[in-house]
Amino acid sequence: MANDYVSTVLLLLSLLIFLSQRTDSASIVKSLPGFDGPLPFELETGYIGVGEEEEVQLFYYFIKSERNPQEDPLLLWLSGGPGCSSISGLLYENGPVNVKIEVYNGTLPSLVSTTYSWTKVSSIIYLDQPVGTGFSYSRTKLVNKPSDSGEAKRIHEFLHKWLGKHQEFSSNPFYVGGDSYCGMVIPALVQEISKGNYVCCKPPINLQGYILGNPSTENEVDINYRIPYAHGMALISDELYESMKRICKGKYENVDPRNTKCLKLVGEYQKCTKRINKALIITPECVDTSPDCYMYRYLLTTYWANDENVQRALHVNKGSIGEWVRCYFEIPYNHDIKSSVPYHMNNSIDGYASLIFSGDHDMEVPYLGTQAWIRSLNYSLIDDWRPWMIGDQIAGYTRTYANKMAFATIKGGGHTPEYKPEESYIMFQRWISGQPL
């Protein structure tokens, strides 16, 4: 009898632990450690379980529009990597708070309000994906490692479950956005949602379009365009560039080992650019432990996100992850989409709007390569190359294509929106409102 009682108690305790870490938990966060006073916006955090057994627990941050959440667009924002936490988007790129940049003294870093949050005109879901990123985790060992196409399916499942629990947003115009490596996943996700709306999944998601910043599209092409970009930005000489064009014939990545002359020239190019910060070429290449380094904010974020009180406030499941890492590049991952261009083509044919933007000082994914794959779609122009303005100042350049695709540069911008927050916000606000840039 005693043994039966003990067994029953242990079973109940196990069940309680399971339920406490079970899927589809959501909590309202009214304050955050490091931020002075109550949050001036509505924040919800939680997990949505995906997979056959809901073994994958995807963590999200949801911030309601500060204007009119009942009618404003709903945006899903993904960070790149793969393996970079969506906290990158929330704290640096387009969210309503940021880490205060000050020398770390052993106490919790502070958070401050931002001026140009995209939540002024849209509600945003920031999602940690793939599993193993940020606060997302798996309750069991995965049978298959994450992949580009697999993530499109998982995120689609996440969205249906999230909207099922937030039905008040099911009729809002829905958009997907992200930058960097998300250029491989988001076009496939848009296609997955579009197909699901017709084939399997009710109610349909009110998908209207997508926005991508400095998006990866095809790895070899993206890298090959770094050479003409470096030449245009005076990082390599005319002579070296002309020699590379002639001998390498435009192929600078995965060079044929028999082409020793090309390999030598590529080596010369690398000597000229190895100390360049490719994310924003006008900033120093530096280590994040130096307070003078731009990336110091990432170190402060690591201290903040690993604090027990912060994780408690965010309602992170205790013990679900080890150390929080902003970008975990060691996630086992299958890069099974070699080019996202066909997905862009299909999404345009299906009538979805898209804005592709490039910081013109990004060398990770140079705007030259982005323009090249857009040209390959052979869309007719409806508004040719022109400056877009903020007040009387040029903020960048833009052109608009048929099939609802627009391209824009951000003058002086880098790999992500964080480097030019005002310009990025105004660009987004105009596009999401249906206005010309």
Swiss-Prot record:
Family per similarity comment: Belongs to the peptidase S10 family.
Pfam families with a match to the protein in the record: Peptidase_S10 (PF00450)
A biological-process GO annotation: proteolysis
Protein name, as recorded: Serine carboxypeptidase-like 7
SUPFAM superfamilies: alpha/beta-Hydrolases (SSF53474)
InterPro entries: AB_hydrolase_fold, Peptidase_S10
EC number of this enzyme: 3.4.16.-
